[in-house]
Curated annotation (Swiss-Prot):
It is found in: Virion tegument. Residues 612-649 have a biased composition (Basic and acidic residues). Keywords: Phosphoprotein, Virion, Virion tegument. Phosphorylated at multiple sites. One of its GO terms (molecular function) is structural molecule activity. Residues 612-662, 840-870 are annotated as: Disordered. Its main location: virion. Belongs to the herpesviridae large structural phosphoprotein family. The gene is U11. One of its GO terms (cellular component) is viral tegument. Pfam families: Herpes_UL32 (PF06070). This is Large structural phosphoprotein. The keyword Chaperone does not apply.
């Protein structure tokens, strides 16, 4: 961009000021120092005046344009430093050749020149190593000499340092100092080392100084942008809203040029919006002397929170001019609020007038004058003296960058009437607060700022947040109603519906009780000692006296919830088991749905277990225990269990849960929901009687394994040895429990289903046809008895094949011979003959019906799909 041909979008400035700014930007690289902060006349040219007043908004806009143009020129005219880097790599290769010739190069020195970033970070080590190497080559000693270069005169060293300083001040236009050795005093190698040291320092000075100025420019752009956009917030005018959105565009170093083009294209809109906003903003000006007190409306407690407080202003007029002060101010320029080295200053208070709600300021440095003023604390902005981004995070002023927007202070240099602007182009607010100042706000909410036209985080909020060391005494006017506080005791208790109600001081409580709710409307007098109504105090004491009311600590609330559930379970179990404990502590326990389900399940199992007189799994003769114990025994067991749980609960322990009990209850609930009823009881009892027919034979086999001889009835006496061998094969299993691991019932009868799948049982048909009055009274339909008789006769005569058992698909069957025997011994003999016959044959006929029996109980494999039903 040709700055002479393309006008810069400055506004409201005189022609001479615009020319001054344009010349500075056009000839930036020709200046001795390109730092904009070192040219105060340039930043002062951005000031816009309306008569004797300075327009803050328009001045900020021109400063923003100035910093944008400065960043643009700084980036466009940055020279290429790669030429210097190429010279550095060439000289480094010369040094490497010497080190290789001496066998001293281990690769460490060469790796430091691999890239620019690594070179910059390790240059201090490189410089020290080069000096030691040059001194060793020149003087033959490894002792480092405290000189910046090897065997150079002090004059040459001074000229080199001046050259480096000039390059640091103006990195856009620099000259390379020529280090030569016309009389060959040092030699080519020493001269190369000196050049390498100098070029390394020059490269770092150029790159680091440019990066520093670029960061300063970006920081000033962002801060000024936030100030300017803060002025334009909360307006309904389209131009102002549009300008506010444009100024809120997030910026980076790469986007500055595009943002500058946007401002140039929308110059008319932004200018008109700023003009309309400036016209609506009124500045209060008072003509006072330099040492007069400035009186303001005091901040009282009865002022509404949205009251517009007056802004502080200082008159620029002065009765007499101080030439010394004027000269000092012009030479010193005005500090910017982003000065990197300076720290924020605060108001020094001479005294605090609490009666008049005023603060007497002592030596408030405003525009170079030491004045005193009385001002409300809320009308003083803490943006004073902030000069660097590092100061934003100061412990005395913890404010974000966006919070530094427009200020309420209209400050000017009183010595000569100029707007006090530092080299950075930002106002200098040298207002100081002492750390021991105290302020009485009388309960007024200082966080509601209506006077500042800054960013959302500016204004009184920033003032209050900035008082890091101030004592703010606020009146406690917002006091909760006395009934909502309870200071009677420092304990917690539980209300009737298990809601924890804290009793600690100052903590409100709620009693979820109808009587208590009614008492709130009736009683309006409260206890002066506890802050609770007399009626509620009486109810609290009454609730504490109840057995169910337990005092708890606040930290034990999670544990108490678990204990409460255990207590409920114990109370419910007492009603179910008939225990002597009082089960009426829980309201509505007898009518709960869970209690009814438990009672129905217990009644169901009690009736079911009365009909079971043998344990199928254990198989012992005369054993009266089955899969589920009897009803009375179960009640005793449950009663004892819950008594133990009660003791454990009282001792603070968690009662152990019964997995079998949980599983049984879950199954009972499924049975009850399926509506099986009494038919399931009958079905289970009949099934148990059916499968217990073969227990006698199984018991004899087990007794033989313990030493009792197994006597098998056979007509072939000569085959005694083979019979004993077969018995030994039968008894190969050493563990009796392993004999029954594959025990199962297999049949195709629809009327008799396995009890382990009762929820899926098909009860669509009438069960009377398949029910059993007694296990020994069952008869097979048709000619079933005749077929079994023929099969047994074949066994007796020693036939090798068994007869087919044609069994109906819808009826259960039992061998008829087992029902006709008169004594148990005869029945055992018949079963033993069938077992022996199965083992001797090895396999059965393929047409026999597979079903559960003794052979399967002994884990005897039946080949194919045939088996003998027992």
């Amino acid at each position: 961009m040709d700055l002479q041909r393309h006008p810069i979008p400055f506004a409201w400035l005189d022609r001479d000021k615009v020319e001054r700014l344009t010349d500075f930007l056009s000839n930036l690289e020709r200046l001795d120092n390109v730092d904009l902060r070192e040219h105060p006349h340039v930043t002062n040219s951005c000031v816009v005046r309306e008569g004797d007043d300075v327009d803050d908004l328009k001045t900020l806009y021109n400063l923003l344009v100035l910093w944008l143009m400065y960043h643009y020129v700084l980036s466009k005219r940055k020279p290429d430093y790669n030429a210097i880097w190429q010279d550095i790599t060439k000289l480094q290769s010369v040094v490497n050749e010497y080190l290789n010739s001496k066998g001293l190069n281990k690769g460490i020195f060469e790796n430091m020149f691999t890239n620019k970033e690594k070179f910059e970070s390790q240059f201090s080590d490189i410089n020290r190593a080069l000096l030691r190497l040059g001194n060793f080559i020149k003087w033959g000693s490894n002792v480092a000499i405290d000189t910046p270069y090897v065997n150079l005169t002090a004059e040459d060293s001074s000229e080199i340092e001046n050259n480096l300083q000039d390059a640091e001040k103006n990195m856009l236009w620099y000259t390379v100092y020529n280090i030569n050795d016309p009389w060959d005093e040092n030699g080519y190698l020493i001269t190369s080392i000196n050049k390498l040291i100098y070029l390394g320092k020059l490269f770092l000075a150029l790159t680091q100084s440019w990066s520093k100025l670029e960061k300063v420019a970006m920081s000033q752009i962002v801060i000024t942008q936030n100030h300017l956009s803060g002025h334009l917030r909360r307006h309904d005018n389209f131009n102002i809203v549009y300008s506010h959105r444009v100024l809120q565009t997030p910026l980076t170093g790469q986007r500055v040029e595009s943002f500058l083009k946007i401002i140039t294209s929308d110059y008319d809109i932004i200018k008109s919006s700023l003009e309309s906003h400036s016209a609506s903003k009124a500045f209060s000006m008072s003509e006072i002397g330099p040492n007069s007190l400035m009186d303001f409306v005091p901040l009282r407690g009865d002022i509404h929170s949205n009251l517009t407080l007056p802004s502080m202003s200082i008159d620029t007029k002065k009765s007499s001019l101080d030439p010394a002060r004027l000269k000092k101010s012009n030479s010193r320029s005005l500090d910017s609020f982003l000065r990197m080295q300076r720290q924020p200053k605060f108001l020094e208070l001479d005294s605090v007038d609490n009666a008049g709600e005023k603060i007497l300021l002592k030596e408030a440095t405003l525009g170079g004058e030491n004045v005193k003023a009385t001002t409300p604390a809320s009308s003083v902005s803490l943006m004073s003296g902030v000069e660097s981004p590092s100061s934003f995070t100061s412990t005395n002023l913890d404010l974000p960058l966006s919070s530094f927007t427009s200020t309420n202070l209209d400050l000017r240099d009183k010595s000569h009437g100029n707007y006090k602007i530092g080299p950075s182009g930002i106002l200098d607010f040298n207002v100081k607060f002492p750390p021991n100042a105290q302020l009485n706000t009388n309960g007024v909410d200082l966080l509601q700022d209506k006077t500042s036209i800054g960013s959302p985080s500016s204004g009184i909020t920033d003032v209050v947040n900035g008082f890091a060391n101030l004592n703010l005494h606020q009146n406690k006017s917002n006091v909760s109603p006395p009934w909502s506080r309870n200071t009677a005791a420092n304990a917690d208790f539980l209300d009737p519906v298990h809601r924890f109600v804290p009793e600690q001081t100052g903590t409100p409580f709620v009693l979820n009780n109808s009587d208590v709710a009614g008492s709130e409307a009736k009683h309006t007098t409260y206890s002066t000692e506890t802050g609770v109504s007399p009626r509620n105090v009486f109810l609290i004491k009454d609730l504490r006296g109840k057995d169910g009311f337990r005092k708890q600590k606040q930290s034990d609330i999670p544990k108490s919830l678990t204990k409460e559930r255990n207590d409920k379970a114990i109370m419910h179990s007492r009603e179910v088991t008939g225990d002597s404990g009082d089960a009426t502590e829980t309201v509505g326990a007898r009518n709960s749905p869970a209690l009814r389900k438990i009672k129905q399940a217990n009644d169901f199992f009690a009736g079911l277990n009365k009909k079971n007189d043998r344990d199928v799994l254990r198989g012992g003769k005369g054993n009266s225990k089955d899969l589920h114990s009897g009803g009375n025994a179960k009640k005793k067991e449950m009663s004892g269990k819950f008594n133990d749980d009660k003791e454990m609960t009282r001792n603070g322990q968690e009662p152990s849960r019964s997995l079998m009990g949980d599983a049984r209850n879950a199954g009972d609930e499924q049975y009850i929901q399926a509506g099986l009823g009494q038919r399931v009881n009958n079905l289970l009892s009949q099934f148990t009687n059916l499968i217990s027919l073969g227990e006698k034979g199984i018991e004899d086999i087990l007794q033989n394994q313990r030493g009792t001889e197994l006597k098998l009835a056979t007509e072939n006496k000569s085959g005694r040895e083979s019979e004993e061998a077969n018995v030994e094969k039968i008894l190969e299993v050493s563990n009796p429990q392993d004999m029954f691991k594959n025990f199962r019932l297999q049949n195709d009868l629809d009327s008799v289903q396995s009890p382990f799948r009762l929820p899926d049982a098909d009860l669509s048909r009438e069960l009377d046809s398949a029910s059993f009055k007694d296990a020994l009274d069952l008869k097979l339909p048709g000619n079933g008895e005749r077929e079994i008789d023929l099969a047994l006769e074949k066994v007796k005569v020693g036939e090798t094949e068994t007869s087919d058992l044609k069994v109906g698909q819808d009826e259960s069957f039992v061998p008829a011979q087992l029902m006709k025997v008169e004594t148990p011994e005869e029945k055992d003999d018949i079963i033993e003959q069938m077992v022996l016959r199965i083992r001797q044959d090895g396999e059965t006929d393929e047409n026999t019906v597979s079903g559960p029996g003794v052979a399967e109980s002994l884990d005897i494999e039946a080949k194919g799909e045939s088996a003998i039903a027992s």
